[in-house]
Amino acid sequence: MASSGAGDRLFGFVQFDFAGTVGLPDGRYLAREPGGPPAPRQGETEDGEQSVLVVSTEGAPAPGRRRRRRPRQSKPEAEPDSLPLARVTAVRAFEPFAGGEEAARWLDAATEAEDTIDVLVDEGAALLNRALHAIAAASGDPYMHSRSPESAVAVRIGYGSGQQVADGEWTDARLVDVRGGTRRRRSDDLRPLERVAAVLGGRERIDTSETLILRARTDLDAGRIREAALQLRVGLEALLIELSGALNDPGHDEDMAVLQERRGEAGELANLALRGELEAEAERRTRELIELAERVLRRRRVLRG
């Protein structure tokens, strides 16, 4: 976005404000779709980049010391320390606007319906989580976690010039609510807080298949199809054992029979994943099996109450 004329062009963006830090150093990160040509190195031309991730943190804590400070007395009446605010802007640099009128029409259309908002917000979150996954792998930190849009204190969709969006600013933007609507209704149907209490109270346990299928979904949504196929293989094996006869429900029995029948298919997909990237058809089958496994798990949660 430092290329000639980029400061005059207008770009759409999705922006997240998070309390605290996100784990990425402040700066601009150029990104292309996996499998495409690499993004330019520092100092090279930036023409034609697919996306830009901009991270800036207000009130960031001072860098850690080599030696820890000695423990200090903490007074109960003391005011809590203020948290830094991390602003993450996912810039849609692959689709610049011809002018202000086009950008304004795009913003109106983008924020008119819930499903359109969700698509753009998920797109921005996927770019952030792709960067977080990369830094976790590069640093060997297994506790670097993904960020969901719902965990942001504010989410915006808007547009601005190249210089504006590079600074986390905009020409026009709308605050969007990502905690309500269909996202909230899906969560309410499952009553997750009741289950949290049951798990922490020792009255219920989390099945291995739940953890593995969740990981498969995380990888799938992040575009890590090979990893998703490998997680699916072991997750499906665990699910077929753990949920066999778990419900007296015709739908459950039917779905379990389909999964049992396609068990070998999951193994084939995992073997393909070990050899390289999966083709579109293999990706479709992986997605289909993960969605079916999720449906089985979801039905069990709903019917058990």
Predicted regions and their residues:
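Charged, non-catalytic interaction/linker regions at domain boundaries
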Residues: 2-207
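Amphipathic, oligomerization/interface secondary-structure segments
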Residues: 181-305
